[in-house]
Design a protein with these regions (language model features):
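Polybasic, Ser/Thr-rich amphipathic helices
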Residues: 186-202
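TRAFAC-class small GTPase G-domain
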Residues: 1-181, 202
Length: 202
């Protein structure tokens, strides 16, 4: 049984959204940076006795695309909100900008928070000027809880560490939300509540 699903990936420019999507869907890591306006990818993901036909939408994080970006949010089942583990400003923008935009434009949609470029934090990034500026796992977990994310995952597109876990978490969050909504509808508003809290994979 195929289940269609739409997940939109958002976050500041240059945090690694496109690299994450390309590596996951094509096993290819891009060598040159090019700002994305909008793009989408598709992949089939097994989920229990079902196969999720996962449509992944890549968006531009730059401010000049702010008025167009929400057009991609229409009928989204969930979101992956990404920040760069070596860039504290990108982490700060999660709560200052991104979660506010998602809650305003897509209220109720589940959000998976993702810290990208894990390889730079783990692989001696101090010589690149990152050093202690890197975001620690506990900080990302705390941020995930603060914004009400379904899960917090740290990954590297380059090494593919935890890369699959990002999209597995997104699919799981969306499927659980659908099931909770279905039960709620069946019981005329008295149905089950979704799982609370924020899981973490780092």
């Amino acid at each position: 049984m195929y289940v269609p699903m739409k997940v939109v990936v958002v976050g500041d420019g240059a945090v690694g959204k496109t690299s994450m999507l390309l590596c996951y869907t094509t096993n290819t890591f891009p060598t040159d940076y090019m700002a994305t306006v909008f793009d989408n990818y598709a992949v089939n993901v097994p989920y229990g006795d079902k196969v999720v036909s996962l449509g992944l939408w890549d968006t531009a994080g730059q401010e000049e695309y702010a008025q167009y970006r929400p057009l991609s949010y229409d009928k989204a089942d969930g979101f992956i909100l990404a920040f760069d583990l070596t860039s504290r400003p990108s982490m700060e923008n999660v709560s200052k900008r991104w979660i506010k935009e998602l809650r305003a434009k897509a209220p109720g949609a589940p959000v998976v928070l993702v810290g990208t470029k894990l390889d730079l934090r783990m692989g001696g990034s101090a010589h690149q000027g990152h050093g202690s500026a890197c975001v620690a796992a506990r900080e990302g977990e705390a941020l995930g809880k603060r914004i009400g994310a379904e899960c917090y995952v740290e990954c590297s597109a380059l090494t593919q560490d935890n890369l699959g876990a990002v999209f597995d978490a997104a699919v799981d969050a969306c499927m659980r939300r659908r099931e909770a909504t279905k039960k709620r509808n069946e019981s005329n508003g008295r149905g089950a509540r979704g799982r609370s809290g924020c899981c973490a994979v780092s």
